[in-house]
Amino acid sequence: MKHRKKLGIEMGRVTAEEYKALPGSGIAVVLDNVRSAHNVGSVFRSADSFKADRVFLCGICATPPSAEIHKSALGAEFSVDWEYCSRTMEAIEKLRAEGYEILCVEQALDSVMLDRFTPEAGKRYALVFGNEVDGVDQEVIEASDGVIEIPQYGTKHSLNISVTAGIILWHFRPG
């Protein structure tokens, strides 16, 4: 057989406790009023896959425990630490005080295209993702240290928040 899918036991999966004991990535995810619990769950799953240290759920974001989050997170809401903040700016202020560089993921006049951005080794980044309708709040953009954007070539120039988070977190993955 030329190619074969891996069996579950061949994937090297760890328990949530073992995962939490692994070295951190220096990446925090901030969800700015993301409306869909499915999207929140999918972001947890990507955060787990790419070893984000924490997810901040802000404003109207659904929070665990939630059957809808669990359905798309597949348990990643238990492996990735999370915090709830009533305002996104509260999370930004906390992360800045902890030494994170705040980067919004948004289409902005001064954004840096993702393919031209290289994360600095050892630097801590807080990646802010906006909601499905309005994106990242302008107040949050103005308070950030920078804006990064995923280059797009189609007619929509619009990716689902969970797809965007997966792409960005892969780009910032450790190693």
Regions found by a protein language model. Give the residues of each.
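Post-transcriptional modification and biogenesis factors for structured RNAs
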Residues: 1-175
